[in-house]
C-alpha cells in the first residue's frame, strides 16, 4: 500500500509542472509587454521586415538576408551561458527530481516512534 502511494506521488510530481510557463498567451500578441498595436499588420513576421526583404521574393533570398545580418549573428553559439539564462523548464525538472529523491529516501528511513501521550 505504501509503495503504491509513493508511486502515485512520484507520478504526480513528475507530471505536474510547478514552474512558470515559457509560452506566451495568444492574446498578448507579438510585442513585449502586452497586446498587439492597433496599427500592426495581420502577419507580424512580414510587418517587421523592411520592403523587399520578404522571403518569397527574389530580393529577399536567404543569401541576401544573411548578408543583411550583423557579422556575429551567424557565429556558433558558445555554451557560456550563466545558470540564470537557462530555461526554467530544465531547472523545474531538476527541482522535481531532487524532491522525488528526497521523498523516496525519506520514505525508506525508519520513522522515530511518536512521543507517548501518557505523561503523568
Swiss-Prot record:
UniProt keywords, alphabetically: Amidation, Cleavage on pair of basic residues, Hormone, Secreted, Signal
Gene Ontology terms for molecular function: gonadotropin hormone-releasing hormone activity; gonadotropin-releasing hormone receptor binding; hormone activity
Signal sequence region: 1-23
Biological process annotations from GO: signal transduction
Tissue and organ expression note: Midbrain; expressed at significantly higher levels outside the brain (up to 30-fold), particularly in the kidney, bone marrow and prostate.
Residue positions, PTM Glycine amide: 33
Subcellular location: Secreted
InterPro entries linked to this entry: GnRH (IPR002012), Gonadoliberin (IPR019792)
Location, primary (coarse class): secreted
One Pfam family here: GnRH
One Gene Ontology cellular component: extracellular region
Highest taxon, organism lineage: Eukaryota
Annotated spans, Disordered: 23-81
Function field: Stimulates the secretion of gonadotropins; it stimulates the secretion of both luteinizing and follicle-stimulating hormones.
Family in the record: Belongs to the GnRH family.
Name of the molecule in the record: Progonadoliberin-2
